[in-house]
């Protein structure tokens, strides 16, 4: 005689093959008996609602991230190639074996950070490689109204591709106005060195003006032109104080009013934009390595740039932009500048560290030399750039056009 099949709870199974029990309505008995067998399926309407709400928040967050200027696809692919992608980057579609080079590049050049040299190189390269170099007739307006942002983004976005747009302008969020976010590049330098170069350039110009007996700012009063740099700093003149000293960070923070206020908010936002929207931010003190990396990242724009840069004729032209009549501030004045520019230095050192990490990934060594007797920001940099001056309109591209026509 066969034993009855025992129920896991100890009793005999009163129904074969899961048939309903007794007179219970069809399906009800089955439901009551099966739920204990599958405890992991138990959930309440509250649990269900919680899960759906969580999913909705995640989807909305993802959408807002993309609409607020998430990284361009090219930068995400590049992160994966370099081995420094984030969790979210890695869970997208894998990059192709050959990276599609971007056809929209913006160089929102920081004043007095080598941009004259780079623009001269770009003019030569655009003829050589056939890309569209887009410049602007406005050289002294970095902060834009909302309407001005929309108009500029529209003009840039409708340019013939591949294009490289260059202008002294604070970071623009194309995605905010419905445009495709381009890839950004830029170069910065030691903040005190940049400030000193600008201070004396506004007053005395460079070697081009010196040779042609040109006065850089004819409307400047003589007492202002010959104002001692130490007096300007120690007596807290506006030109040597904040917010005027808070100069580099806004180029990366953006157009928000708080980006012009020295503080942690602008600093952190600038770092975030560097990570998400800039293909490369180099430092002027290592310009050759900057050009080498640009040639590797953007060969259809920068192929052969290092050879052109090292050409004696080009270097001769570039050296004409060196600022003249620089003097060295006192150690006391320098320490005050350091204190006033602490956010600028925190950003500079962050960018420098990221740049060196990138160099190591490409097998480039960062040569650390012994510290000079004087601080390094007093050592003249061979190639300077022109600064957009707020109080005087100018055409800082004309000299490039004249040189290029020779």
UniProtKB/Swiss-Prot annotation:
Pfam families: Sulfotransfer_2 (PF03567). Changing residue 321 to A/R: Severely abrogates catalytic activity but does not affect 3'-phosphoadenylyl sulfate substrate binding; may be involved in polysaccharide substrate binding specificity. GO terms for cellular component: Golgi membrane; membrane. Residues 387-399 have a biased composition (Acidic residues). Changing residue 168 to A: Abolishes catalytic activity but does not affect 3'-phosphoadenylyl sulfate substrate binding. Sulfotransferase that catalyzes the transfer of sulfate to the position 2 of uronyl residues in glycosaminoglycan chains. Has mainly activity toward iduronyl residues in dermatan sulfate, and weaker activity toward glucuronyl residues of chondroitin sulfate. Has little to no activity toward desulfated N-resulfated heparin or N-sulfoheparosan. This is Uronyl 2-sulfotransferase. It is a single-pass type II membrane protein. The keyword Membrane applies. Belongs to the sulfotransferase 3 family. Widely expressed. GO terms for molecular function: 3'-phosphoadenosine 5'-phosphosulfate binding; chondroitin 2-sulfotransferase activity; dermatan 2-sulfotransferase activity; sulfotransferase activity. Residues 1-49 are cytoplasmic. InterPro entries: Heparan_SO4_2-O-STrfase (IPR007734), P-loop_NTPase (IPR027417), Sulfotransferase (IPR005331). Residues 387-406 are annotated as: Disordered. The active site is at residue 168. Its main location: Golgi. The chain crosses the membrane at residues 50-70. Its EC number is 2.8.2.-. Glycans are attached at residues 84, 140, 155, 173, 319. Keywords: Glycoprotein, Golgi apparatus, Membrane, Signal-anchor, Transferase, Transmembrane, Transmembrane helix. GO terms for biological process: dermatan sulfate proteoglycan biosynthetic process; establishment of cell polarity; regulation of axonogenesis. Changing residue 109 to A: Severe reduction of catalytic activity but no effect on 3'-phosphoadenylyl sulfate substrate binding; probably disrupts binding to the carboxyl group of the iduronic acid of the polysaccharide substrate.
């Amino acid at each position: 005689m066969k034993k009855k099949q025992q129920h896991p709870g100890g009793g005999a199974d009163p129904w074969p093959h899961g048939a309903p029990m007794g007179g219970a309505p069809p399906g009800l008995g089955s439901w009551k008996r099966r739920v204990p067998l599958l405890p992991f399926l138990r959930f309440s309407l509250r649990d269900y609602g919680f899960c759906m709400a969580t999913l909705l928040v995640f989807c909305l967050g993802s959408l807002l991230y993309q609409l607020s200027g998430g990284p361009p696809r090219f930068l995400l692919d590049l992160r994966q190639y370099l081995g420094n992608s984030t969790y979210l980057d890695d869970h997208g579609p894998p990059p192709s074996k050959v990276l599609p080079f971007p056809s929209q590049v913006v160089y929102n050049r920081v004043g007095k950070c080598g941009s004259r040299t780079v623009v001269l190189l770009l003019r030569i390269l655009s003829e050589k490689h056939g890309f569209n170099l887009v410049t602007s007739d406005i050289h002294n307006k970095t902060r834009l109204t909302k309407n001005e942002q929309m108009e500029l983004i529209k003009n840039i976005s409708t340019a013939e591709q591949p294009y490289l747009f260059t202008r002294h302008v604070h970071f623009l969020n194309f995605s905010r106005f419905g445009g495709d976010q381009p890839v950004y590049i830029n170069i910065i330098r030691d903040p005190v060195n940049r400030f000193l170069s600008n201070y004396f350039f506004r007053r005395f110009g460079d070697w081009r003006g010196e040779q042609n007996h040109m006065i850089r700012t004819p409307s400047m009063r003589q007492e202002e032109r010959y104002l001692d740099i130490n007096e300007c700093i120690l007596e807290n003149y506006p030109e040597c104080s904040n917010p005027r000293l808070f100069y580099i960070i806004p180029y990366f923070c953006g157009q928000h009013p708080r980006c012009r206020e020295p503080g942690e908010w602008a600093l952190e936002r600038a770092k975030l934009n560097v990570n998400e929207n800039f293909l490369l931010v180099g430092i002027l003190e290592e310009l050759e390595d900057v050009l080498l990396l640009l040639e590797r990242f953007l060969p259809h724009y920068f192929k052969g740039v290092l050879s052109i840069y090292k050409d004696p004729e080009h270097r001769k032209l570039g050296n004409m932009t060196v600022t003249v009549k620089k003097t060295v501030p006192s150690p006391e004045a320098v320490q005050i500048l350091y204190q006033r520019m602490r956010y600028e230095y925190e950003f500079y050192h962050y960018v420098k560290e990221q740049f060196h990490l990138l160099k190591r990934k490409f097998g480039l060594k960062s040569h650390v030399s012994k510290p000079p007797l004087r601080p390094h920001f007093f050592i003249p940099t061979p190639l300077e750039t022109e600064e957009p001056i707020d109080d005087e309109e100018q055409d800082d591209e004309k000299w490039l056009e004249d040189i290029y026509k020779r």
